[in-house]
Amino acid sequence: MAPLGYFLLLCSLKQALGSYPIWWSLAVGPQYSSLGSQPILCASIPGLVPKQLRFCRNYVEIMPSVAEGIKIGIQECQHQFRGRRWNCTTVHDSLAIFGPVLDKATRESAFVHAIASAGVAFAVTRSCAEGTAAICGCSSRHQGSPGKGWKWGGCSEDIEFGGMVSREFADARENRPDARSAMNRHNNEAGRQAIASHMHLKCKCHGLSGSCEVKTCWWSQPDFRAIGDFLKDKYDSASEMVVEKHRESRGWVETLRPRYTYFKVPTERDLVYYEASPNFCEPNPETGSFGTRDRTCNVSSHGIDGCDLLCCGRGHNARAERRREKCRCVFHWCCYVSCQECTRVYDVHTCK
């Protein structure tokens, strides 16, 4: 069997045996484009537990936004990790879209759960504010009285509704009394808290001749890039935990506690994990690592995106790459821009 075929087969087997959130595949599958118009497709979304299936049928008109949220979460993950050994690669020929990487309770798994949960809350909240779903809209729960010279107006985005959708849908399968479910619930909530803590006021001036006699203000979500940056910082400072078992009336329950007591206890906005990450230097179908061979590296950087670290000490190749680009652009009155086309040579460095 070819290496890629073996890799995909192993991915499929591992997701079937584990608790992989394979419903994330709805963001890249054929269901994504038609989910809102055909409610019966809820039953065809892979990996849904009964509670998620009921939620899908009850809120089918916002399910395209759920799919969109997963999609923007994946895209943001790939942006944030573009210069890392693990660059949030997805496997589009498998329902387990990240391969076996998320089978372990690592920092990477913590980040992916957080950014996906945040993406769902973000996309649903935005969709409601845009009026694309009849069951939701703008928020009427303003925080505080208007200040001097301004009043509440516009459409405050309803992050409480978006957060509820994310919580009810994403957390539905995380109800087992084991450590991994506890970790996933915590990191899902950290993603939602990232959105809620970054809500900010936007205001618009009203008055004669452009004056600002009065302002109307509303609550708005940040750009999702700010959420990605915030959660990436949380990834870098994630709290390592240990698993503890204790007996309750329902049986044995696993909980998490910080491994190191001299560090601060993680808050609901922090990411947590309890298993070490692989180094991702070499291809390994067991861990889901694709390795870093042929990855572009930054020869002038001493960081993780630099050739020394990204290439794991194997060295790198260099080549000259010619690119045709627009150049010497001139604005003409009125109103167009004319450009010439130039060939430029760039040095490209890739890992051996």
Swiss-Prot record:
GO terms for cellular component: cell surface; early endosome membrane; endocytic vesicle membrane; endoplasmic reticulum lumen; extracellular exosome; extracellular region; extracellular space; glutamatergic synapse. The record marks 26-27 as: Cleavage. Changing residue 209 to A: Abrogates WLS binding. Changing residue 335 to A: No signaling activity despite the presence of significant amounts of secreted monomeric Wnt3a, exhibits dominant negative properties. The gene is WNT3A. Pfam families: wnt. Glycans are attached at residues 87, 298. It is found in: Secreted, Extracellular space, Extracellular matrix; Secreted. A lipid is attached at residue 209 (O-palmitoleoyl serine). Keywords: Developmental protein, Disulfide bond, Extracellular matrix, Glycoprotein, Lipoprotein, Secreted, Signal, Wnt signaling pathway. It comes from Homo sapiens (Human). Moderately expressed in placenta and at low levels in adult lung, spleen, and prostate. Disulfide bonds join 77-88, 128-136, 138-155, 203-217, 205-212, 281-312, 297-307, 311-351, 327-342, 329-339, 334-335. Belongs to the Wnt family. Ligand for members of the frizzled family of seven transmembrane receptors. Functions in the canonical Wnt signaling pathway that results in activation of transcription factors of the TCF/LEF family. Required for normal embryonic mesoderm development and formation of caudal somites. Required for normal morphogenesis of the developing neural tube. Mediates self-renewal of the stem cells at the bottom on intestinal crypts (in vitro). GO terms for molecular function: co-receptor binding; cytokine activity; frizzled binding; identical protein binding; protein domain specific binding; receptor ligand activity; signaling receptor binding; transcription coactivator activity. This is Protein Wnt-3a. Residues 1-18 form the signal peptide. One of its GO terms (biological process) is dorsal/ventral neural tube patterning. PANTHER family: PROTEIN WNT-3A, WNT RELATED. InterPro entries: Wnt, Wnt3, Wnt_C, Wnt_CS. Palmitoleoylation by PORCN is required for efficient binding to frizzled receptors. Palmitoleoylation is required for proper trafficking to cell surface, vacuolar acidification is critical to release palmitoleoylated WNT3A from WLS in secretory vesicles. Depalmitoleoylated by NOTUM, leading to inhibit Wnt signaling pathway, possibly by promoting disulfide bond formation and oligomerization. Proteolytic processing by TIKI1 and TIKI2 promotes oxidation and formation of large disulfide-bond oligomers, leading to inactivation of WNT3A. Forms a soluble 1:1 complex with AFM; this prevents oligomerization and is required for prolonged biological activity. The complex with AFM may represent the physiological form in body fluids. Homooligomer; disulfide-linked, leading to inactivation. Interacts with PORCN. Interacts with APCDD1 and WLS. Component of the Wnt-Fzd-LRP5-LRP6 signaling complex that contains a WNT protein, a FZD protein and LRP5 or LRP6. Interacts directly in the complex with LRP6. Interacts with glypican GPC3. Interacts with PKD1 (via extracellular domain). Interacts with FZD5.
